[in-house]
């Protein structure tokens, strides 16, 4: 059995790879491992709007109850809400049934520990080992020792909305905002939060039917929202993904504003408020060099991690940083939540637009995005480190870096899943970096022939 857990829990095509049987086993093993020692453990369960959610929830909950834990089912709710509410309700763990931005046929199961953090690799491995060993050593409970399922009646959604609203001071009166809910988990929470804060709210893609989640909508397909914002003269647009742990924005001119710009704007604002700990933001190696240049001008440091919000969070926790995130719109505000939170991000941005009295596009001028080129070089899995060993390749990378002279960069990343090495170049001249990236990729391919 290969590793069951990916970078974001267990994912697969529902009923084919992620079966009801596997969901039952994950519920049973997860509840047992995460609640050892608790008298009558409590586990919070939420999901996004996918049709397969009901099937997987039933199986997952059966597994949880079989080891004597209580399952508190809160229904459709954003992933970051489960992270927050697990802490608020003093639950022993939280579980979300969601495949985030993936198409409807996929689903996933993701655990949070009692502090609202995603599980460490070690805990995930313990859960997998227990399943592999066919639950050896896990007692079979009967009678009064079996757990109960508790259906929650809407209080969880209310608590999460109140929490999200509390992350900004004042209101959003006078702001005209368009929201794209991706027919996903934020279709109630984001709309209510913005309305209750006094914004004029326009909404698209907030009628989930079980199969339209992420379909030509949300943060992975923001084209309709870009058009809508301009047509309806909105001050800004905000696009969530299926489980609302990420958010991208649209300025009043219809331009897409990615996570790099959001980090730049929010980082500057936090610094102004004296809340940017150690004057540092945490980003990944894929963040545009334009962000580094912009932050240098603001006297803000950027620390880079591997790609993946879990690595961003790891770095933030290690050094107590206040904000970090990815281009994709996964933004973590450690003062507020333990994971990327689309609604919290959206509210921070909207609040800055209102408070600063500038248009959103003016705020975005803080940063100039450098052209970026990504070329894949086909390389056998056992030779993916050739760019670190071969002298000619190393020399070519050094030459390109020298010629870019601080206004560009070369980044080589082996793919974690395919026989590829990704060659990424950034610089001021699109044509030039395009040529350089292709010739470097070709050199790498020729070396492994």
Swiss-Prot record:
MF terms (GO), sorted A to Z: magnesium ion binding; phosphoglucosamine mutase activity; phosphomannomutase activity
A Pfam entry, by short name: PGM_PMM_III
Binding site for Mg(2+): 100, 241, 243, 245
Active site per database record: 100 (phosphoserine intermediate)
GO BP field: carbohydrate metabolic process; peptidoglycan biosynthetic process; UDP-N-acetylglucosamine biosynthetic process
Keyword annotations of the record: Isomerase, Magnesium, Metal-binding, Phosphoprotein
EC number(s) per entry: 5.4.2.10
Keyword Isomerase: yes
Cellular component GO terms, alphabetical: cytosol
Cofactor(s) annotated in UniProt: Mg(2+)
Catalysis performed (reactions): alpha-D-glucosamine 1-phosphate = D-glucosamine 6-phosphate
Co-factor: note: Binds 1 Mg(2+) ion per subunit.
Residues that bear Phosphoserine: 100
Class of the enzyme per the UniProt entry, highest EC level: isomerase
PTM text: Activated by phosphorylation.
Entry-linked InterPro entries: A-D-PHexomutase_a/b/a-I (IPR005844), A-D-PHexomutase_a/b/a-I/II/III (IPR016055), A-D-PHexomutase_a/b/a-II (IPR005845), A-D-PHexomutase_a/b/a-III (IPR005846), A-D-PHexomutase_C (IPR005843), A-D-PHexomutase_C_sf (IPR036900), A-D-PHexomutase_CS (IPR016066), Alpha-D-phosphohexomutase_SF (IPR005841)
Family in the record: Belongs to the phosphohexose mutase family.
Known function: Catalyzes the conversion of glucosamine-6-phosphate to glucosamine-1-phosphate.
Protein name, UniProt field: Phosphoglucosamine mutase
Species whose genome carries this gene: Clostridium botulinum (strain 657 / Type Ba4)
Lineage of the species this protein comes from: Bacteria, Bacillati, Bacillota, Clostridia, Eubacteriales
